[in-house]
Amino acid sequence: SAPAQWKLWLVMDPRTVMIGTAAWLGVLALLIHFLLLGTERFNWIDTGLKEQKATAAAQA
C-alpha cells in the first residue's frame, strides 16, 4: 500500500538504514573488484608483467 509506506520510517531509523546501505555497497564494490583482480582477463594491475616475462625469456 503506497500511502502507508511512510510508516516504515517510524519503525526503522533512516540514518541507520543509510549507513547500512552505504556500508553494504562499499563491501559489494570491494568484493567485485577483488574478484576481477583474481582473473587473468580483467586484472588491470598485472597487465604488463606477463609480457615482460615473455620478452625476457625470449631474449635469454
UniProtKB/Swiss-Prot annotation:
Species in which this protein is naturally found: Rhodocyclus tenuis
Subcellular location: Cell inner membrane
Chief site of localization: membrane
Periplasmic side: 38-60
Protein's UniProt name: Light-harvesting polypeptide B-885 alpha-2 chain
GO MF term (any one): bacteriochlorophyll binding
Membrane-topology annotation of the record: Single-pass type II membrane protein
GO biological process: photosynthesis, light reaction
Lineage: Bacteria, Pseudomonadati, Pseudomonadota, Betaproteobacteria, Rhodocyclales
One GO term describing the cellular component: plasma membrane light-harvesting complex
Cytoplasmic side: 1-16
Assembly, per entry: The core complex is formed by different alpha and beta chains, binding bacteriochlorophyll molecules, and arranged most probably in tetrameric structures disposed around the reaction center. The non-pigmented gamma chains may constitute additional components.
Amino-acid positions noted as binding a bacteriochlorophyll in the UniProt annotation, renumbered to this chain: H33
Keywords per UniProt: Antenna complex, Bacteriochlorophyll, Cell inner membrane, Cell membrane, Chlorophyll, Chromophore, Light-harvesting polypeptide, Magnesium, Membrane, Metal-binding, Transmembrane, Transmembrane helix
Transmembrane segments: 17-37
Record-stated family: Belongs to the antenna complex alpha subunit family.
Main function: Antenna complexes are light-harvesting systems, which transfer the excitation energy to the reaction centers.
